[in-house]
Amino acid sequence: MAATADSAKSLGLAACVAVVVGNMVGSGFYLSPAAVAPSGLLAVVMWIVMGVGAICLGLSFARLATLAPATGGPYAYARMAYGDFAGFLIAWGYWISVWASLPAIAFAFAGALMNLLPALNNKAMALALTLGAIWAVVGINLRGVKAAGLFAEVTTYAKLLPFGAIALVGLFYVRAENLSEFNPSGEPLLSAAAALAPLTMFAYLGLESATVPAGDVRDAQRTIPRSTLIGIAIAAALYVLGTVVVLGVVPRDQLLGSVAPFADAARLMWGEGAALAVALAVIVSSIGALNGWTLLMGQVPMAAAQDKLFPGAFGRVSARGVPALGIVISAALATLLVAFQASGSPGVRAFYNLLVSLSTMTAVVPYAFCALALPLVAAWRGQRGPGAPRLGVVELIAFAFSLFTIYGCGPEAVLYGLTLLLLGLPVFVWQRRQARKEEAC
């Protein structure tokens, strides 16, 4: 019976790798070279440093998934380790980071499509494309986890070919003079590195993706750790090599104002046809990332709602087995963010940067908690004594990496992030009160 139940689950190794890579290699990948261009070669060093931190976080999540696979990922582990209140805050913050990142990815999709088809380049069309992308992907996810996983596989493997070609073949086109400056910003090294942390970390968000839908993963104790590490390794290689190529091919002055740095690099190396192929890959990449994050957007609050820590609406499952109402509510909040930007308050680039910092801040806090959760989760599972799992160097590096990223987000993003976390307190109090009433009946 156990085997039958496991074989009926929707996500295997290929789908889990696709979800991890698809979530990580999104807008942060192909927009980041322009954002980090003022930092020169220091940006490449930071991709490597943050990649090491991401791998350590991935190993931490892999150990947790092997010990206690549970739907909800970071939320589930935080609740096991620290109790209901910490679990709620982690679920709340993680959920915010997911739906707040959707407009940033959708903005990138709209920008890439308008760059490809200049006739679409106007404010009304940008708004329509952004919202259309979000709600089209919501429609795919409402069809079920299997459909979302298949879509993740198709979009991920479709975008790896052009991005991989630039990252590998493009190395032969790098001009040494474009890579001559290590830290041209003139800022102290630590300050410059800290400023790069959220920009690079945003591209690594999603490293835990395979742990979130654990209840739908076949052979979860083996599949989740393997897919997590494979996905991080693929993404890190693309980030480091891709950034070297773009910085080494596109002149710095041109790169600083670029809205499509990978397309610019492809154009300089191979002509307009290659730039067109990259633009198409960016569009596919954005849709794939939107799909993966939408999948997670419903799973985390669903797990919390089933534990009576989130409103019950988030835990209601449709006939197709998906938390449909939770996905729709989350997408509606993302739509409000898009509408706020469309009202003319912040510019698109400034708003994108704010969303990057906010999403990074609210996602990295759960990472920090989970990095130290292993021995507590082991105790929750009844494993105590000399042979029980303990914190190692990997977990301590992951924790330090998370703290450094929070520091790099800056006071404004930290303040916004903490404010959003505190706004969840009335929800927690209300849910606990409702749970006590149900227990008393």
Name every feature range the model reports, one short phrase each.
Residues 8, 31-123, 129, 231-237, ...:
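Extracellular loop-to-transmembrane helix junctions
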Residues 1-4, 76-79, 106-129, 162, ...:
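Helix-loop-helix connectors at the membrane interface of multi-pass transporters/channels
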Residues 2-8, 43-44, 120-126, 154-280, ...:
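Helix-loop-helix junctions that connect adjacent transmembrane segments
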Residues 125-176, 187-188, 228-232, 360-368, ...:
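Membrane-interface loop-to-helix entry segments
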Residues 363, 376, 388-441:
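A generic transmembrane alpha-helix motif of multi-pass inner-membrane proteins
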